[in-house]
UniProtKB/Swiss-Prot annotation:
InterPro entries: Ntn_hydrolases_N, Pept_T1A_subB, Proteasome_sua/b, Proteasome_suB-type, PSB_actinobac. HAMAP family: Proteasome_B_B. GO terms for cellular component: cytoplasm; proteasome core complex, beta-subunit complex. Belongs to the peptidase T1B family. Its EC number is 3.4.25.1. Residues 1-60 form a propeptide. GO terms for molecular function: threonine-type endopeptidase activity. This is Proteasome subunit beta. The formation of the proteasomal ATPase ARC-20S proteasome complex, likely via the docking of the C-termini of ARC into the intersubunit pockets in the alpha-rings, may trigger opening of the gate for substrate entry. Interconversion between the open-gate and close-gate conformations leads to a dynamic regulation of the 20S proteasome proteolysis activity. It is found in: Cytoplasm. Keywords: Autocatalytic cleavage, Cytoplasm, Hydrolase, Protease, Proteasome, Threonine protease, Zymogen.
Length: 288
């Protein structure tokens, strides 16, 4: 294998770039320049413990996903924390993976964003090499492999925990996949949430979810769930009307990925806030 210096000094591309190979970009990078992978750079010594490593890097917190007939929604709050310190108020944690899928991130924010960028490139590379897009299951499995590759850093406190959602062109349905830090992949049904406020968000969605949701209904339920999570979890940020910071909300349907604009979210959030001035704990489901 030629080094970067060898081919850079000649001003040409190395043989690895000119030889047909596998359709996985991350596997190609592992063989050619593993130091550029998120998991390819060792942590410095002296951190002391996994919790200490986790406290030096901003952490993204709560992500929710809701399936509805003909699509799926993915939403995330905007707060990142370092221990008990608010590191950022307007971080974005929901990204398009490709035209028909999206990924939300919880865990170590910097590493997670890097994994998302590599995942986006992975899907684009596969499509260019193979001439077709990966299936929804194929995309979910590729992401699982990438998360598994980050296990060593996760064991040192820098975990990446994504939530993957996509529109399945074969079935015409929205699908949701969750992961653990070992790369274990699990398909979820109807709705799911990850991150520090996930237990509160999921509890809210249990009462709010309806199988006949429209995309607009799902957006309302997602913002309500994130509001409940922020109410009980200090690491989750609620909507900030003064700074005009709203959750990132995206829907994926047969028309592709669409992020809801802030103007649309502003109206939705204000209506929810108005209702909560009357009922602070949010909408209540009937007992029977």
């Amino acid at each position: 294998m030629e080094s970067n210096a060898d081919w850079g000094s000649r001003g040409g591309l190395p043989q690895a770039f000119l030889t047909p190979g596998i359709s996985s970009f991350s596997e190609f990078l592992k063989g050619f320049a593993p130091e550029y992978l998120p998991s390819g750079r060792p942590l410095p010594g002296g951190l002391g413990s996994a919790s200490a490593a986790g406290d030096i890097a901003p952490h993204g917190t709560t992500i929710v996903s809701i399936a509805f007939p003909g699509g799926v929604l993915l939403a995330g709050d905007r707060r990142a924390t370092m221990g008990n310190f608010i590191a950022q108020r307007d971080i974005e944690k929901v990204f398009p993976a490709d035209e028909f899928s999206a990924v939300g991130i919880a865990g170590s924010a910097g590493l997670a964003v890097e994994v998302v960028r590599l995942f986006q490139l992975e899907l684009e590379h596969y499509e260019k090499i193979e001439g077709v897009t990966l299936s929804t299951d194929g995309k979910a499995n590729r992401l699982a492999t990438m998360i598994r590759g980050n296990l060593a850093m996760a064991m040192q406190g820098l975990a990446v925990v994504p939530l993957f959602a996509g529109y399945d062109e074969e079935t015409g349905q929205g699908r949701i996949f969750s992961y653990d830090v070992t790369g274990g992949m699990y398909e979820e049904h109807d709705f799911y949430s990850v991150g520090s406020g996930s237990m509160f968000a999921r509890g809210a969605l249990k009462k709010l979810f309806r199988p006949d949701f429209t995309a607009e209904d799902a957006a309302v339920a997602a913002v309500q769930a994130l509001y409940d999570a922020a109410d009980d979890d200090s690491a989750t940020g609620g909507p900030d009307l003064f700074r005009k910071i709203f959750p990132v909300v995206a829907v994926v349907t047969e028309d592709g990925y669409r992020r809801l604009p802030d103007e649309e979210l502003s109206t939705l959030v204000e209506s929810i806030m108005d209702a909560r001035r009357v009922v602070p704990d949010g909408p209540r489901s009937p007992l029977r």
